[in-house]
Design a protein with these regions (language model features):
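Alpha/beta-hydrolase superfamily serine-hydrolase fold, recognizing
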Residues: 1-132
Length: 132
């Protein structure tokens, strides 16, 4: 159960899929994943329920939104950025480019990459603004 006084002060959204069901954003991998994960196999109603942008209001916490130049979900970030702007939610948006090679989906999890360190340091700096 969620504590009544819980207040999320900031969130990070990294290399994510934020909107489901857009025909132009649909791909076989995502469609198959939704069929497996959602009880009714990814009906339009279920897809609407998992759309992040459905839940963005002016009360949404500040966002660190990140993707990478070769992330297969890269087109999702600008869609969410548009919603954040419309709702006047404070956010930082970064699309990372590699210093030595092209960066792909969730590159920031590879701690051996200097580019991952750069991304994670920036994300930590973002959160420091919201720590007491």
């Amino acid at each position: 159960q969620t504590p009544q006084d819980l207040k999320i002060r900031a969130v990070a959204l990294n290399c994510g899929q934020y909107h489901f069901g857009l025909e132009e954003m649909s791909n076989e991998m995502t469609d198959n994943l939704m069929k497996e994960l959602l009880p009714e196999g990814g009906t339009p109603e279920e897809l609407e329920l998992v759309n992040v942008d459905t839940y963005v209001t002016e009360n949404f916490p500040p966002v660190y939104l990140m993707t990478a130049e070769k992330d297969f979900l890269k087109e999702q970030a600008p869609l969410l950025e548009k919603v954040l702007k419309e709702k006047k939610v404070p956010y930082t948006y970064s699309c990372y480019e590699g210093t030595k090679k092209k960066l792909e989906h969730v590159f920031h999890l590879n701690m051996k990459l200097a580019d991952a360190e750069r991304c994670n340091d920036a994300e930590c700096e973002f959160f420091r603004q919201y720590c007491r």
